[in-house]
Amino acid sequence: MAYDDSVKKEDCFDGDHTFEDIGLAAGRSQREKKRSYKDFLREEEEIAAQVRNSSKKKLKDSELYFLGTDTHKKKRKHSSDDYYYGDISSLESSQKKKKKSSPQSTDTAMDLLKAITSPLAAGSKPSKKTGEKSSGSSSHSESKKEHHRKKVSGSSGELPLEDGGSHKSKKMKPLYVNTETLTLREPDGLKMKLILSPKEKGSSSVDEESFQYPSQQATVKKSSKKSARDEQGALLLGHELQSFLKTARKKHKSSSDAHSSPGPEGCGSDASQFAESHSANLDLSGLEPILVESDSSSGGELEAGELVIDDSYREIKKKKKSKKSKKKKDKEKHKEKRHSKSKRSLGLSAVPVGEVTVTSGPPPSIPYAGAAAPPLPLPGLHTDGHSEKKKKKEEKDKERERGEKPKKKNMSAYQVFCKEYRVTIVADHPGIDFGELSKKLAEVWKQLPEKDKLIWKQKAQYLQHKQNKAEATTVKRKASSSEGSMKVKASSVGVLSPQKKSPPTTMLLPASPAKAPETEPIDVAAHLQLLGESLSLIGHRLQETEGMVAVSGSLSVLLDSIICALGPLACLTTQLPELNGCPKQVLSNTLDNIAYIMPGL
């Protein structure tokens, strides 16, 4: 009887492929439909033929058959887990032990259906029976298929995937996950979302602790067409999800081994406990047997079970970092602006000591002169140092400008000749070019005799002497003006003693504003040193002129230098009592008057 039921079930399943095509076609392209369903039809036909041939030989009793299927289920669990999930955790191994020890019988599907429909005892009693019948027949046929598939499939990749899907779907109705997105958070921060269609979201109902099965939509499916359609959807979706898990495992071995742990539906409580133990945003314990009603999804919507990579987690991190860096930059700019404003305000408004400016809410840059806040004197000190630095920089710039001023070059005899003779050539040849003018000047200079050239050389030396003399006088004037200013400052303070009037014998000379010079030997030595320096400077300048100086000038310099030397020497007579015949006042006035006739000053 069981064999006949399975044969009828398979015939009904083969006849309903057109309805399945319509149900699963929504949201997919025509090429994918044709390929997937043609392959599926071929496999189903081959499996059906092999099951018919093998069942006649091997299955004599239904009891023996059920015992064989129970042992086969255990073997399939081991083989599928070893083939796909070789690196699973210890929790999965403990689940396998529980599965082995739990007694399995032909009533497993019935018990599951009772557990599914128990919350809906009042509303769905008539639908329970139809669901139980359809699920019982489907589980019977699927167990036959699996038993023979073990021999045929060998080591092929596609058949084990379908075996896993059909083996798990035979025990229960389709499982729906109510979470909108199944998120896989990789170590890099990448999120992968399994997006379900909106109609499936509405029809799904799952608790956080354990998976619950659909209440009314699952039990309303009365005919075998619905169950066959659901089984086919489970096979296809399980195939897609497992292929994705393979690719993910290649990229991230460590993470995928811990994540990909689909628990079979035979022990739903164990699977829920395993899912709870992994509290890292993972809902993958039932990925393989997820069944999707793809007839509810439209072409414009996202396809049910489509995997989308979401980079929002990384983008949020980047945005946070960019916001932090922007805030830091804004703070630094704000501080710089405040600092510059405080400098300007302190430089512009110099409040005198003792005055207190009363203002409502004064800004931090304006300090109180009488009672200033404690942190405010610091910027004042900073600005003082800044102003000193500015002054030093200005002085350095001035010195550089002075040094950079081009000194007048020494004019050669040829240059002096060209300067004077150029006028005559331009008058003779108006509109002459610069090149031709220079050529003519060179020719004339070559034709000049040696006597004329010597005259031009003497003229050049005389001009150079004038230039040097002018520079020396300007330097001395600057030095004397600075000394005079220093003396005026000292007299204003009152450090010096009151002035002494000169005697009536020297009424022709005005009295010196400064203190009368002393007649001590140190003062005499200072006067003699000044005289020596001035005479050496004069001699150096005379050597440059080479005989162009008049005799009267040299004689005047010699006479002045003799007077300037004898005056200080006369002051030394005060040191010996035998020679001390001149009063001190006369000697001091002589030293004072020497400064007017000292040469070079």
From Swiss-Prot:
GO terms for cellular component: NURF complex. InterPro entries: DUF4171 (IPR025228), HMG_box_dom (IPR009071), HMG_box_dom_sf (IPR036910), HMGXB4 (IPR042477), HMGXB4_HMG-box (IPR048016). Coiled coil: none annotated. There is a cross-link at residues 8, 191 (Glycyl lysine isopeptide (Lys-Gly) (interchain with G-Cter in SUMO2)). Residues 407-475 bind DNA. Pfam families: DUF4171, HMG_box. Keywords: DNA-binding, Isopeptide bond, Nucleus, Phosphoprotein, Ubl conjugation, Wnt signaling pathway. Residues 51-410, 473-514 are annotated as: Disordered. GO terms for biological process: endosome to lysosome transport; negative regulation of Wnt signaling pathway; Wnt signaling pathway. CDD domains: HMG-box_HMGXB4 (cd21982). GO terms for molecular function: DNA binding; identical protein binding. Residues 394-404 have a biased composition (Basic and acidic residues). Residues 212-221, 270-282 have a biased composition (Polar residues). Residues 316-344 have a biased composition (Basic residues). Negatively regulates Wnt/beta-catenin signaling during development. This is HMG domain-containing protein 4. It comes from Homo sapiens (Human). The lineage of its organism: Eukaryota, Metazoa, Chordata, Craniata, Vertebrata.
